Curated annotation (Swiss-Prot):
GO molecular function, one term: IMP cyclohydrolase activity
PANTHER family, sorted: BIFUNCTIONAL PURINE BIOSYNTHESIS PROTEIN ATIC, BIFUNCTIONAL PURINE BIOSYNTHESIS PROTEIN PURH
EC number: 2.1.2.3, 3.5.4.10
Protein's recorded name: Bifunctional purine biosynthesis protein PurH
Catalytic function, reaction form: (6R)-10-formyltetrahydrofolate + 5-amino-1-(5-phospho-beta-D-ribosyl)imidazole-4-carboxamide = 5-formamido-1-(5-phospho-D-ribosyl)imidazole-4-carboxamide + (6S)-5,6,7,8-tetrahydrofolate; IMP + H2O = 5-formamido-1-(5-phospho-D-ribosyl)imidazole-4-carboxamide
InterPro entries from the UniProt entry: AICAR_Tfase_dup_dom_sf, Cytidine_deaminase-like, MGS-like_dom, MGS-like_dom_sf, PurH-like
PROSITE patterns, alphabetized: MGS (PS51855)
Pfam families the UniProt entry points to: AICARFT_IMPCHas, MGS
Naturally occurring in which organism (per UniProt): Parasynechococcus marenigrum (strain WH8102)
Entry note about domains: The IMP cyclohydrolase activity resides in the N-terminal region.
Annotated pathway: Purine metabolism; IMP biosynthesis via de novo pathway; 5-formamido-1-(5-phospho-D-ribosyl)imidazole-4-carboxamide from 5-amino-1-(5-phospho-D-ribosyl)imidazole-4-carboxamide (10-formyl THF route): step 1/1; Purine metabolism; IMP biosynthesis via de novo pathway; IMP from 5-formamido-1-(5-phospho-D-ribosyl)imidazole-4-carboxamide: step 1/1
Keywords: Hydrolase, Multifunctional enzyme, Purine biosynthesis, Transferase
Domain MGS-like per the UniProt entry, residue ranges: 1-146
Organism domain of life: Bacteria
GN (gene name): purH
Length: 516
């Protein structure tokens, strides 16, 4: 008897091509229902309708289609169990070898502003999860596919295994199936809780395991990466290089967040590059082309850039690739790499190259999630953009046009530096970064010493207010001509007075940007 494949999907992307390969290449008989059956029939494929297979029609307006012993018996029967096989033979039930099911679009339905309670309830799938769970439970004998993303890899595996799905892949598919149904049920419970004002977070849904990482922050720590496919870093494509580590991903996240201040991909306002070490930017710059922006970012602090992570907001071409080969780097992320760039960078076999599309970034959602002992903290991303017309002049002297441009650049950077954070910048390039000190003047001292002689004529940004006038006085002693900070200290007046005395311009943003 030909093997049986059951197909019943809400997301019909790729289902015709999958069914054609199953039937015409691997000899599967096709069992289907409702809209999926019609799509397959319209494509000229022979399909046994579920009502014909079960000997019973769909009832209750389609609420009951697949909840039948001929379906679940065929899925759950253990092939090596004589009693199970006897039951199938006695009832005339064919075994079902492959189940392709994805569920009613509940999340998409409840995301609509005009959705009613009854509409949402009707989009709670019952038969689909039952088939998925049954197939996942019996993964020793049945393969279960819950996403179009799985189709090509499963067909490739079948092509190498005489039309069968390998056992190790069946087990992985079962894991993903249980994750799929768990996330689905969590979405329903979250929605129902929201109706009674017990709103939760989407991050409390089950998030599938993407991969086991090389190690955690240190080699003695084990680590795993959980991520939704196609969302954020889950949608990144690693083109070459070693396996990613926890630190790689944390640094990549910091680098990407910083470079996105200048737009990303088609939305880039101009070429920009960022170099990160230990989640802090050590070099940030803009330029007329990607290669020049990258060179300027590396030149900002080549000592710290060694072993760093680079993010670029535009396509990487050959000139930028050659710049990247000039020192040891861990990872590079960009929207794309040209064939010439990839050929050049292939010489650095251990360098991890990641392509991350703007669509994957957009799909990640607005939440910033951190863990604490036994729980999660979920907050909005700190990604609201302030424009210079929202800032307040605090000093007698306004900044010059060049100073104002430099202050805007520095302000974009400082919120991506660990608090207490100070950035010294000029002409679209960071010159010194002071991060993570327990007092603000300590961070300022680090940033100014890093900038050295380049601090003369540069500007300084602070992620929090100046509690005393010591920071602006230190800045002036190094040649800083303008500063920007949120303001809000009870002693703001002292810092303003010091700036007026020393000839500095000061802008107040009214918004703090702590980063822990």
């Amino acid at each position: 008897m030909a093997p049986f494949a059951l197909l019943s999907v809400s997301d019909k992307n790729g289902v015709v091509a999958l069914a054609e390969a199953l039937h015409r290449t691997h000899g599967y008989a096709l069992l289907s229902s409702g809209g999926t059956a019609k799509v397959l029939e319209d494509a000229g494929l022979p399909v046994t309708r579920m009502s014909e297979h079960n000997g019973a029609p769909e009832i209750l307006g389609g609420r009951v289609k697949t909840l039948h012993p001929r379906v679940h018996g065929g899925i759950l029967a253990k092939r090596g169990d004589a009693a199970h096989q006897a039951d199938l033979e006695q009832q005339g039930i064919p075994a079902i070898d492959l189940v392709v099911v994805n569920l009613y679009p509940f999340r998409e339905t409840v995301a609509r502003a005009d959705v009613t309670w009854d509409q949402a309830i009707e989009n709670i799938d019952i038969g689909g999860p039952a088939m998925v769970r049954a197939a996942a439970k019996n993964h020793a004998d049945v393969a279960v596919l819950t996403s179009p993303d799985q189709y090509s890899s499963v067909l490739a595996a079948m092509a190498e295994s005489a039309g069968r799905v390998p056992a190790d892949l069946c087990r992985q598919l079962a894991l993903e199936a249980f994750q799929h149904t768990a996330a689905y049920d969590t979405a329903i419970s979250r929605w129902m809780a929201g109706e009674v004002e017990l709103v939760s977070s989407p991050w409390l849904e089950a998030v599938p395991l993407r991969q086991t990482l090389r190690y955690g922050e240190n080699p003695h720590q084990k680590a795993r990466w959980f991520s939704h496919p196609r969302q954020g870093w889950g949608g990144a494509i690693q083109l070459q290089g070693k396996e990613l580590s926890t630190n790689n991903l944390l640094d990549l996240e910091a680098a990407l967040a910083t470079v996105r201040e200048f737009g990303y991909g088609p939305n880039a306002v101009g070429p920009a590059a960022v170099v990160v070490k230990h989640t802090n930017p050590c070099g940030v710059a803009v330029g007329p082309v990607v290669a020049s922006a990258l060179t300027r970012a590396l030149d900002a602090d080549r000592v710290s850039a060694f072993g760093g992570i680079v993010a670029i907001n535009g396509p990487v071409e050959a000139a930028a690739a050659r710049e990247l080969t000039g020192l040891f780097l861990e990872c590079v992320v960009a929207p794309s790499f040209s064939p010439e760039a990839r050929e050049i960078l292939a010489a650095k076999a251990n360098l991890r190259l990641l392509e991350l599309s703007p669509d994957a970034i957009a799909a990640a959602g607005p939440d910033h999630v951190r863990s604490i002992l036994g729980g999660l903290l979920v907050q909005d991303l700190d990604d609201q953009v302030m424009t210079p017309d929202q800032w307040t002049l605090a000093t007698k002297r306004p900044p010059t046009a060049q100073e104002k441009q430099d202050l805007e650049f520095a302000w974009r950077l400082v919120r991506h530096v660990r608090s207490n954070a100070i950035v010294v910048a000029r002409d679209g390039q960071s010159l010194g970064v002071g991060a993570g000190q327990m007092n603000r003047v300590g961070s300022a001292r680090i940033a100014l010493e890093a900038a050295a002689e380049k601090a003369k004529g540069a500007v300084l940004a602070s992620d929090g207010f100046f509690p005393f006038d010591d920071t602006v006085r230190l800045a002036a002693s190094h040649g800083i001509t303008a500063v920007i900070h949120p303001g809000g200290s009870l002693r703001d007046g002292e810092s303003v007075k010091a700036c007026d005395e020393l000839g500095l311009a000061m802008l107040l943003t009214g918004r703090r940007h702590f980063l822990h």
